[in-house]
Design a protein with these regions (language model features):
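N-terminal capping/small domains of soluble enzymes
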Residues: 1-97, 336-349, 353-355, 361
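Flexible glycine/acidic-rich beta-alpha junction loops that bind and position SAM and/or redox cofactors
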Residues: 12-13, 210-225, 251-263, 289-290
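Glycine-rich, proline-tolerant flexible connector loops at the mouths of alpha/beta enzymes
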Residues: 24, 178, 222-225
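Conserved active-site and cofactor/substrate-binding residues in soluble primary-metabolism enzymes
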Residues: 25-32, 56, 120, 153, ...
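Active-site-proximal beta-alpha core segment in soluble small-molecule metabolic enzymes
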Residues: 42-211, 218, 236, 240
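Short glycine/threonine-rich loop-to-helix capping motif typified by GTGT followed
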Residues: 183-189, 221-233, 260-271, 333-336
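Acidic/histidine-enriched ion/cofactor-binding microenvironments in catalytic or ligand-binding pockets
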Residues: 207-210, 232-245, 332-347
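Charged (often Lys/Glu-rich) extended helix/loop segments that serve as interaction or gating elements
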Residues: 249-398
Length: 398
């Protein structure tokens, strides 16, 4: 389940060519991980990638998954510019603005799939489809008890009155209850609940949901000594799916489970010093560029390595601090390193999901690091150059 880690030597080339701080995404690992899920689920479930986890991997993932989930207008523009086939897109109803939905409908019409978050939203689709005479495929989002989606009653009403809007094809239910789930029994409970609901609709309205778009929120171990429960979680999900009375198609929608393991964040040591018997490494990156979601800073130890690694000296505990002028800018506390020095590069692992987008990347107007892809076949490839951000933090002046 857990991926193969890139060799230290491979990073040498990237460091020399692109400098630091730097994000590296191992495309081979992304494909390995996706193959791994394919292999485990086979016929029992399809795979959908939520691109919010790592929009840089949109193109790669669109080739290896069945579907791409788009949650914002920006994400839609990414897919459009990359010319991802409309048929692969699931447009999430979290896009609340009517004009956004209308814009997407005007571009792709019935070729995409859409999730519906509210009855009001359904009416935007009904109006568009009757005006344009084009059929639209929708998934009704069932709430998990928060502000998203609709309750069972609202969904039942829609199903009951489906003959009134023949241009809307209800494909199924969309359900997502939260992420980094801790217990396997949560998956089986949810799947049993969804099974019961889909079955009820079949019995009560003579209507079969053909699909269930389900976001399990599988937990990913980011840190040292964190248990990897992936194998066990997959078994539980598979067993629960095979036990369903409802026999439609299940599509698993995931983000970090696919991509967390492919990412690395590289930052270079500028200075090493001792303050009151504590060893500090000051690096050129910082907490604004690396964020493990769910991390309480300093509480967990991310998996890190140092390049070059064969230095002489004794292993000591070091605290790695970034370049931001805040005492909170601690990347790792008490990590054991052997003689780090100026020019040593600290490589953070498991930085493939959310790590680059959840930090405060505009803070202090630092530039955004470059992003590179790595694959055995093509070596390193620049995906995005370093970007200045100061322009976004100042008034436009003539």
């Amino acid at each position: 389940g857990s991926g193969d880690v890139m060799d230290l030597e491979k990073f040498e080339h990237a460091i020399t060519k692109y400098g630091t701080p730097l994000y590296v995404f191992d495309i081979d690992e992304v494909k390995r991980k996706t193959d791994y899920f394919r292999d485990r689920f086979r016929e029992s479930a399809g795979l959908c990638f939520a691109i919010k986890a790592n929009p840089f991997l949109t193109c790669t993932m669109s080739k290896v998954t069945d579907r791409i989930e788009v949650c914002s207008m920006g994400e839609f523009e990414i897919c459009r510019e990359l010319q991802i086939e409309a048929e692969k897109l699931l447009i999430s109803g979290v896009l609340k603005k009517k004009e956004d939905i209308t814009e997407i409908l005007n571009i792709y019409g019935g070729r995409c799939r859409y999730t519906v978050e509210s009855v009001e939203q359904l009416y935007s689709y009904i109006n568009w489809s009757s005006t344009h005479g084009e059929k639209i495929n929708v998934y009704l989002r069932l709430t998990s008890g928060n502000q998203f989606g609709m309750d069972e009653e609202a969904i039942e009403k829609i199903i009951a009155s489906r003959d009134q809007f023949p241009m809307i094809k209800v494909c199924g239910i969309h359900f997502f209850s939260g992420t980094q789930k801790k217990t396997a029994e949560k998956f089986s409970k949810e799947i049993a609940y969804l099974d019961k609901f889909c079955w009820k609709i079949e019995q009560k309205y003579g209507f079969t949901m053909s699909e269930l778009e389900y976001g399990p929120g599988i937990a990913v171990p980011y840190f040292k000594d964190q248990e990897d429960t992936l194998e066990a979680d997959i078994e539980v999900i598979k067993t629960a799916i095979s036990g369903m009375k409802w026999k439609g198609k299940v599509m698993l929608e995931m983000g970090r489970a696919f991509v967390a393991s492919c990412g690395y964040y590289l930052t270079c040591v500028h200075e090493c010093k001792k303050n009151n018997d504590r060893n500090y490494c000051i690096v050129d990156g910082g907490m604004h560029q690396i964020q493990y979601d769910g991390q309480i800073r300093g509480m967990y130890q991310p998996k890190c390595r140092m390049y070059p690694d064969g230095r002489e000296g004794k292993k000591e505990k070091w605290t790695i601090c970034g370049a931001l002028c805040t005492a909170n800018d601690v990347l790792v506390r008490d990590i054991e390193l052997t003689a780090p020095g100026e020019g040593s590069v600290i490589i953070f692992e498991n930085a493939g999901a959310y790590a680059m987008t959840e930090g405060m990347s505009l803070f202090l107007s630092h530039e955004l690091p470059a992003v590179v892809f790595y694959s055995e076949k093509e070596g390193f490839k620049l995906a995005r150059n370093k970007q200045e951000t100061y322009k976004w933090n100042m008034e436009d002046h003539k």
